[in-house]
Amino acid sequence: MDINGNAFVVGSGSGIGRACALGLAKGGAKGILIADINLEAANRVATECRGATKYMIEIFERIDYCINCAGIGVQLARNISEADFGEFSRFLQIHVEGTFLLVRSVSAAMQLQELRPIDPTNPGRGGARGSIVTLGSGNSFAAAPHLVQYTAAKHAVLGVTKNAALDNAAHGIRVNCVCPTWVETPMIQSARDGGVEIDSWVKGMVPLGRIATAEEVADTVIFFCSPRSSYATGCGFLLDGGTTLTCHV
């Protein structure tokens, strides 16, 4: 998919991040830096983001694609009347603050990079300095019962993405958000362990009748990294197996 630059993947130890790193490698990425930043260490996140970005530039000289897959899943679903404030704050810290700090750091680095033609044979496509992809969720668009911490965090991730896309557009940097619903990852298993009845919900609500694979999400992420999506920025791309095609009453 015309992937020949350098990729910076955060949260690639397992699940979607791992699938993205492997997909980029198979797709021909010149270099890949895998980083697992500790987003729960609030006093160190900004420093770790800057340090990882600086290291990426030192090793590969530029960042062509940045993908943030770091996140946590809900382990205890609760009604809003019983929701735990500490857990709510933790979700905002990891998903929202982590996304903001990483996107801020990478945007600053990309803005200093050389503008390269997207397609030398088609000048009308213009030039690019890089592409950033964040990971939202179906909950970036809609709420789900007893998941206020996750819904709030994923709405905010999409908001950060849209504003970053707007601020970066003049610099030739695209920023998009891939928003899957249920994906077969360790995070989903963690939600199962916490009592969320994912499998029965999927059978009744998803037209395609199954949970997505991590590789299917990675394919979408890589599309938004590639020049084939050169006119797409600020998108929240819903990858839901048709879940939102109908109204479930």
Curated annotation (Swiss-Prot):
Key word Transcription regulation present: no
Keywords carried by this UniProt record: NADP, Oxidoreductase
UniProt-recorded name of the protein: Short-chain dehydrogenase virB
Family indicated by similarity: Belongs to the short-chain dehydrogenases/reductases (SDR) family.
GO MF terms, alphabetically ordered: oxidoreductase activity
Amino-acid positions noted as binding NADP(+) in the UniProt annotation, renumbered to this chain: 16, 104, 150, 154, 183, 185
Pfam families referenced in this protein's UniProt entry, alphabetically: adh_short_C2 (PF13561)
Species for this entry: Hypocrea virens (strain Gv29-8 / FGSC 10586)
Organism classification: Eukaryota, Fungi, Dikarya, Ascomycota, Pezizomycotina
Record EC number: 1.1.1.-
UniProt-listed InterPro entries: NAD(P)-bd_dom_sf (IPR036291), Sc_DH/Rdtase_CS (IPR020904), SDR_fam (IPR002347)
